[in-house]
Amino acid sequence: MSTRVVQRGEGERRYTARGSVMLFKALAEQDGGDFSLMERTLPPGGRRPPPHRHMNCSEAYFVLDGLVSVTVEGEDLEVGPEGFVLVPRGTGHTFGNAGEQEARLLVIHAPAMDAYFAGLHELWLRDKPPTPDEERQLMARFGMNPA
């Protein structure tokens, strides 16, 4: 493992899904799988992930721009710039853009989850969007359960 510097607009991998762009700044392969970090852009009105629980990792959001809605165990929250949300392992949640402008946030998974997003990207590259059942099957492969 070596020190890495990733500048604004740069990333190790770029994935898209549900109209969102995910630019990974840190990947599992770079630090033994301890965590992954992405800069995620959410379009207004974009599709939210189905409510789910990460059974194998915690997830955290730091909002850079815009307004993000986060539902945690049925409680709706709105988080603006410089706001932070920690979703502990096993906690039901979903999130999306709550504003009329694009939202940007940093998303951290510990341990890393970048392999899941690579799979999600592949599902969304097809001619038609994946079915909710296809997304749930992928989620289950990575220790994510419906909430």
Spans of features found by a protein language model:
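Short, conserved beta-strand element in jelly-roll/cupin
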Residues: 39-43, 53-71, 108
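A short, N-terminal "cap"/entry segment at the start of jelly-roll beta-barrel domains
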Residues: 1-36, 123, 127-147
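Structural motif
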Residues: 21, 60, 67-69, 76, ...
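Short acidic-glycine-tyrosine-enriched beta hairpin
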Residues: 7, 13-15, 74-92
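Hydrophobic small-molecule pocket/channel-lining residues, especially in calycin-type beta-barrels
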Residues: 54-55, 68, 84, 94, ...
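Soluble, non-transmembrane catalytic domains of enzymes that act on hydrophobic metabolites at membranes
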Residues: 51, 72-73, 95
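Ligand-binding loop in jelly-roll beta-barrel domains
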Residues: 89-114
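Conserved short histidine dyad/triad with adjacent acidic residue
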Residues: 8, 23-25, 38-54
